[in-house]
Amino acid sequence: MTIFDNYEVWFVIGSQHLYGPETLRQVTQHAEHVVNALNTEAKLPCKLVLKPLGTTPDEITAICRDANYDDRCAGLVVWLHTFSPAKMWINGLTMLNKPLLQFHTQFNAALPWDSIDMDFMNLNQTAHGGREFGFIGARMRQQHAVVTGHWQDKQAHERIGSWMRQAVSKQDTRHLKVCRFGDNMREVAVTDGDKVAAQIKFGFSVNTWAVGDLVQVVNSISDGDVNALVDEYESCYTMTPATQIHGEKRQNVLEAARIELGMKRFLEQGGFHAFTTTFEDLHGLKQLPGLAVQRLMQQGYGFAGEGDWKTAALLRIMKVMSTGLQGGTSFMEDYTYHFEKGNDLVLGSHMLEVCPSIAVEEKPILDVQHLGIGGKDDPARLIFNTQTGPAIVASLIDLGDRYRLLVNCIDTVKTPHSLLKLPVANALWKAQPDLPTASEAWILAGGAHHTVFSHALNLNDMRQFAEMHDIEITVIDNDTRLPAFKDALRWNEVYYGFRR
């Protein structure tokens, strides 16, 4: 069972009574056939549910109203099978607060050249019925997604499935609670921001809990539960000599397991699916949570360090979007550079907290080593390299009057040398179009040093995310040129200024 099993997408057919009952009967039959086929053959992430035909303003308004109040409904897919006068949709679309996709398709793929007549033409009017629907969306300044293609086309299936992932993630985000253990890292700007504005825009709430509250739960974990979890560690990871039974750091592993169990219990009891920590606020914890955070991220929790609630929420959102896809998604930080003519590289990592979902090793190394930050006992962590191939890094920032999503397309590469003295998980990549352009553009756009790294998602996914939430997106990829990029930032400033 995945998170998508908790949601459904409604399939709505637009028509009218002008064409008579026989035409509407055929429309209904076509709709049933298409929905059944899509649910069976299209490998969609969640179920399509066919709703009654929308043939009058009252029927359409009722469908939209019901969609708003049904928590299982993640969005609407609308098919204008015949011509459906768009004034009938105004009241419904005015109140609709769920994502909307217009499926611009028709029942038949090929025209029946020898038998086509006006009955066929009146029944299959997507070509101009869809344009009428598009006009009212533009007139109402309501942007919605559009997918054109036959309902048996695999590319159409993939695009609808991708949109469904966005719709489910948006609905899930409305219920997302972010827990901050402690506050923001002192004097850091980009990790701070307006939590009220974020809840208005995205729906997730952000609140702070004292680390002492967490410590109480951690200390309540039984030794039996700790030992059972460490047994799981033994089977899942390659334990270094220091972490094995009778090893000099074995107690640190036991303590890391206790922290993991305590954190998970705290998050489950509070209904949290994203959280932050900060090494400046660890009172009562024996070590900075490293292994615990890594494993919780792998289970789908959002996380970011230093109180960075925006990145923690974004990671959770992207975890939901990428559920079931190939490749992992993790908290990340651009840490240091390798400058070499024609081969500039970025080494990404964090103090401890990189998600094992992006690991290339089947069994990462579990080790305990010194950490000079935080002033606590040496923390346990998983150490691994990252899968190679195309990926993205994304950052969500608060500009005061709006949110900006930055996305850099990257290519992860194999680490050319063993990092024998680097005791943390890491990723190595080439930034597109090149490191000077990418880093300068990122800095000019105000991108954070914390990001979400993903092999599972791509630029199109993040474009859909930005469009669905009506936020600015700034893209850095192989097509980026700095003069045009700077112009786009200026134009966006004017555009969003007019929308205030």
UniProtKB/Swiss-Prot annotation:
Function of the molecule: Catalyzes the conversion of L-arabinose to L-ribulose.
Keyword presence, Manganese: yes
Record Gene3D superfamilies: 3.40.50.10940
Organism the protein comes from: Shigella boydii serotype 18 (strain CDC 3083-94 / BS512)
UniProt-listed Enzyme Commission number(s): 5.3.1.4
Cofactor field: Mn(2+)
Cofactor note: Binds 1 Mn(2+) ion per subunit.
Keywords of this entry: Arabinose catabolism, Carbohydrate metabolism, Isomerase, Manganese, Metal-binding
Domain of life: Bacteria
Magnesium keyword on record: no
An example Gene Ontology CC term for this record: cytosol
Signal peptide positions on this chain: none
Biological processes, Gene Ontology terms: L-arabinose catabolic process to xylulose 5-phosphate
InterPro entries found in the cross-reference section: Ara_Isoase_C, AraA_central, AraA_N, AraA_N_sf, Fuc/Ara_isomerase_C, Fucose_isomerase_N/cen_sf, Lara_isomerase
SUPFAM superfamilies: FucI/AraA C-terminal domain-like (SSF50443), FucI/AraA N-terminal and middle domains (SSF53743)
Chemical reaction(s) catalysed: beta-L-arabinopyranose = L-ribulose
Subunit structure: Homohexamer.
Associated pathway: Carbohydrate degradation; L-arabinose degradation via L-ribulose; D-xylulose 5-phosphate from L-arabinose (bacterial route): step 1/3
Residues annotated for Mn(2+) binding in this entry: 306, 333, 350, 450
Protein name per the record: L-arabinose isomerase
Gene: araA
Matching Pfam families: AraA_central (PF24856), AraA_N (PF02610), Arabinose_Iso_C (PF11762)
Lineage, uppermost ranks: Bacteria, Pseudomonadati, Pseudomonadota, Gammaproteobacteria, Enterobacterales
Family note: Belongs to the arabinose isomerase family.
